């Protein structure tokens, strides 16, 4: 298990890199780039942090970390809406590692950041799909590697996360699916928590500086209560996601996904309302968080599908 002090150091290192290289202007530049992410920042994350090697065992050239370590990095990237291939790459690595004999060469390339990975849960909406080199699909309880495939970018609500429609041309079976969709849900939930925390921070800062009726709007009791409620919602969701990272069961994954989706959607909606008209100007970041909230809530599975699955799991429990 990674010691808490090392995990905190990891968080601080990633946060420092993001603060230095992924400000609002840099995020917008990455959104508009050919590959949809900042390649120089990606190299820094791989070389200085080992972000793409965290979940790979040391004997295969990785850092030998845990799911919680990857979640910390994803959370910090989500906080700043950093366009990054880390989520898809990490999931592809975990899928490859599930095989009886993992492809060491592919894992090395992914760990170094020289190859980009993608996991196919829904072939119509694949994260990193248009830039992926290594693709693994999870269908009908099996993991399959797509050795040849075609990719077509699709329109998205969230400009900070590109998706693509993939079609397989040649495949090879890997192994039974150990539940990679649950892992994907947990990592996405961690990303949502980071974004929700930043939404609250932006809203509190604005409420302290925006003056109306001769006083900052944040001093009004009604707004204080709304922001306090939002803080509690995010803190509770953060705890649920942390628990899922340490015990990634299907029920915990579904619960984390629902809690994080609710936290981010609520934080983004409150942020839009409390900022007022400035929140929907292109120059402000809040509208990007709003789009990320709604795009992420529907990614992988819709909240309704997660609730339906969670309901069946709960009722089947002894």
Curated annotation (Swiss-Prot):
Binds 2 FAD per heterotetramer. It holds the Pfam family Acyl-CoA_dh_1. Gene3D superfamilies: Acyl-CoA dehydrogenase/oxidase, N-terminal domain, Butyryl-CoA Dehydrogenase, subunit A, domain 3. FAD binds at residues 210, 277. Pathway: Steroid metabolism; cholesterol degradation. InterPro entries: AcylCo_DH-like_C, AcylCo_DH/oxidase_C, AcylCoA_DH/ox_N, AcylCoA_DH/ox_N_sf, AcylCoA_DH/oxidase_NM_dom_sf. It is an enzyme of class 1 (oxidoreductase). Keywords: Cholesterol metabolism, FAD, Flavoprotein, Lipid metabolism, Oxidoreductase, Steroid metabolism, Sterol metabolism. GO terms for molecular function: acyl-CoA dehydrogenase activity; flavin adenine dinucleotide binding. Involved in cholesterol degradation. Catalyzes the dehydrogenation of 5OH-HIP-CoA to 5OH-HIPE-CoA. Can also use octanoyl-CoA and dihydroferuloyl-CoA, with lower efficiency. Cannot use 3-oxo-4-pregnene-20-carboxyl-CoA (3-OPC-CoA). Belongs to the acyl-CoA dehydrogenase family. This is Acyl-CoA dehydrogenase IpdE2. It comes from Mycobacterium tuberculosis (strain ATCC 25618 / H37Rv). The gene is ipdE2.
């Amino acid at each position: 298990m990674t010691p808490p002090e090392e995990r905190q150091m990891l968080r601080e290192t990633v946060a420092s890199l993001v603060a230095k290289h992924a400000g609002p202007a840099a995020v917008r530049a990455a959104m508009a780039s050919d590959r949809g992410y900042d390649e120089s920042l990606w190299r820094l994350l791989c070389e200085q942090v080992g972000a793409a090697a965290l979940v790979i065992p040391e004997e295969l050239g990785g850092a030998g970390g845990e799911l919680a370590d990857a979640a910390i990095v994803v959370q910090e990237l989500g906080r700043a809406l950093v366009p990054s291939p880390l989520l898809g790459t990490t999931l592809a690595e975990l899928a490859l590692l599930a095989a009886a004999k993992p492809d060491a060469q592919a894992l090395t390339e992914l760990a170094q950041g020289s190859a980009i990975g993608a996991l196919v849960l829904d072939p119509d909406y694949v994260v990193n799909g248009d830039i992926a080199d290594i693709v693994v699909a999870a269908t009908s309880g099996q993991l399959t590697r797509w050795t040849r495939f075609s990719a077509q970018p699709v329109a998205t609500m969230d400009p900070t996360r590109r998706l693509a429609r993939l079609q397989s041309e040649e495949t090879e079976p890997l192994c039974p699916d150990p539940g990679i969709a649950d892992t994907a849900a947990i990592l996405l939930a961690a990303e949502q928590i980071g974004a929700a925390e930043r939404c609250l921070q932006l809203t509190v800062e604005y409420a302290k500086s925006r003056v109306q009726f001769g006083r900052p709007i944040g001093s009004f009791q009604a707004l204080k209560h709304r922001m306090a409620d939002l803080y509690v919602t995010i803190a509770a969701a953060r705890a649920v996601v942390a628990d899922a990272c340490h015990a990634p069961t299907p029920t915990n994954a579904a619960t984390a996904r629902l809690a994080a989706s609710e936290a981010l959607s609520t934080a983004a909606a409150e942020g839009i309302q409390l900022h007022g008209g400035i929140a929907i100007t292109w120059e402000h970041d809040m509208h990007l968080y709003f789009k990320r909230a709604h795009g992420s809530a529907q990614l992988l599975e819709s909240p309704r599908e997660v609730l339906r699955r969670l309901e069946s799991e709960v009722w089947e429990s002894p």
